[in-house]
Regions:
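Short acidic/glycine-enriched loop/turn segments that link adjacent beta-strands
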Residues: 39-43, 141, 207-212
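Glyoxalase I/VOC metalloenzyme domain signal
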Residues: 1-34, 47-202, 210, 217-238
């Protein structure tokens, strides 16, 4: 997979905008970048995350509570931290500041609770072509993604492929709900995923002159956005 950016982005949904912005901007001290109106009552507040972007999607209407499993913890490398500092954000998402280099993390690590570790090993090695650095640990660019069995995790039921707007709507619940991988060729990567039998979340769609995106889902149904962003790759083909 040809990456356009060597850092994976993290998407959070929340109803508690002020508290979440204060936590990540003031307590964690991530630099605020910009707000993007997503539509359908959603505004995305973007924070720099050591090359990644933390996307806080504020939803105007009430959304369901956090669910077990899935993207469960975010570890952030922090040279100011002499020892691991576990905490929870205002929505209860697990966040950890960790000394730089601890367990090989010099950027961020995304932790996933899964139903079947073997299925995730195959998915990240074969479909996402990530570098295996240990049992249940892979490196995608500079970002580490790890997973372990979670008895509370539940595999989503497969449903007919929806459009991107419907896929985003189905993610709406409190918590870390998706990750974004920036690639050179969204359509080419999506075709490759489909040829391998990867679970489709949504077919590619163009977002004006900004990006072309699609969604795939991991073996448990967690969403992964595949994004070809014009600011990284040049103009989006017509």
């Amino acid at each position: 997979m040809e990456l356009a950016k060597r850092f994976v982005d993290v998407g959070i949904f929340t109803n508690r905008l002020d508290e979440m912005r204060a936590f990540y901007g003031e307590r964690i001290r991530l630099p605020y970048e910009e707000m993007l109106p997503v539509g359908a009552g959603v505004r995305q507040y973007r924070f720099g995350l050591l090359g990644s972007v933390l996307k806080i999607n504020h939803v105007r209407d009430p959304i369901p509570a956090r669910v077990a499993g899935g993207y469960r913890k975010l570890s952030i490398s922090d040279p100011r931290t002499p020892m691991p500092l576990p905490m929870q954000d205002p929505d209860g998402n697990e966040v950890e500041l960790a000394p730089s280099g601890q367990h090989g993390v010099n950027q961020i690590e995304i932790h996933i609770g899964v139903t079947d570790e073997a299925a995730f090993e195959n998915f990240y090695a074969d479909a996402l072509q990530a570098e295996r650095i240990g049992a249940g640990r892979f490196k995608l660019g500079e970002t580490i993604i790890s997973f372990r069995h979670d008895p509370a995790a539940v595999r989503a039921e497969k449903s007919p492929t929806a459009g991107a707007a419907d896929a985003i709507a189905s993610m709406r619940a409190v918590g870390m709900r998706y990750i974004t991988v920036q690639v050179r060729d969204c359509d080419g990567e999506h075709r490759r995923f489909m040829s391998m039998g990867v679970w489709e979340g949504a077919a590619p769609v163009t977002l004006g002159a900004v990006a072309r995106i699609s969604f795939i889902r991991d073996p448990d149904g967690n969403f992964i956005e595949i994004s070809q962003r014009a600011s990284l790759t040049g103009p989006i083909p017509a």
